[in-house]
Amino acid sequence: MSQHYDAIVIGAGAAGMMCASVAGQRGKSVLLIDHAAKLAEKIRISGGGRCNFTNLQAGPANYLSENPHFCKSALSRYTAQDFLNLVKKYRIAYHEKHKGQLFCDDSAEDIIRMLKSECDLGKVQWRMPCQVKEVQRTDAGYQVLTEQGIFSAAQLVIATGGLSIPKIGATDFSYQIARQFDLKIVEPRPALVPLTFDPKAWEPFVPMAGISLEVDIATGDKKNKTIFREDLLFTHRGLSGPAVLQISSFWQPGEAITVNLLPDVDLAEELIAGKGTIKKNIANHLATYVPARLAEGLLAANGIAGDAKIADLTDKRLRQLGDNMNRWQLIPNGSEGYRKAEVTRGGVDTRELSQQSMMVKNCPGLYFIGESVDVTGWLGGYNFQWAWSSGFAAGSAIES
């Protein structure tokens, strides 16, 4: 005989714990199931262990989806300020890093303990670690067959996330359930991920691994151009850092990315105008703008000797160098994949869901929340805010 609840939430991550705590505190009986032994591993490792738990600037414009309007309702009903108020209630010390990004002063564990306490307040029951073997629809709702027994509920919430970082337990469970109930899925792909390049083409830049600098980075055509100003990091296989993670969510295979290594300097004009006054050789002069190792590598890639005097270089060569540094175009051959992706773009098609409750329109009582849905935030706390907002929306909608 199965144990019955008002709701079963599968996935004890950010969205799942938020949903369970909200429903539980509204007097609903809730069971939270997860296949992992530890709670919310993604929270634990995020932000270098300090969890970038939200962003004060979070709004619909910071999210990607085939339906960009879908996230508006949930984000407006549970805002970054709402989550911050919860953090303050638990006296968790935090700081704003930049661009509205909020981090714990001490540890991401503070956020996990807070969410666990909120679940305890709602008398949420737990089954962890517990593998789900099968989900069935019944006349009374849903039945979940697990290695620890059979559980049933009028409502079932899928909060198992996407495919990112499989080493901490990511699986395609949410997509399996979506397919079982004939829901459309927007093709998942890695997002917020380092980009890679053809090994032979990248060879001259391998020695630059570890170099970091602020850049403008862009992709897309004139109508759909996306640009960010963030730090870029050279790696042995390509490019990473916040700039590249941001643009990776917008980049399409086969497209170029354009990097402006000197976003506030028109290098060609500066070099040509300074031919008579700049006494340094070209390498030393460029090293006033970018790390010396990068200056040397870029000069070599442009066929210019580092010890050349600026006055001895033609305007054409200087303009070519300037263009290559202000408008450096590269075509990635791929990304580092789900192994290093912070999130998954794509997921359950939002047209299948109610934007107010996250419930499947044609399957009463079935909900999808968090990263399992085709809503992907920018880098900087936006994806956690979507977890809180979508979890709150579903938790508020669950009925006895």
Q: Which residues make up each language-model segment?
A:
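Short hydrophobic core segments
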Residues: I8-I10, V132, F151-K167, A178-R179, ...
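Glycine-rich FAD pyrophosphate-binding loop
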Residues: G24-G48
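Feature captures the FAD/FMN-dependent oxidoreductase FAD-binding
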Residues: R77-Q155
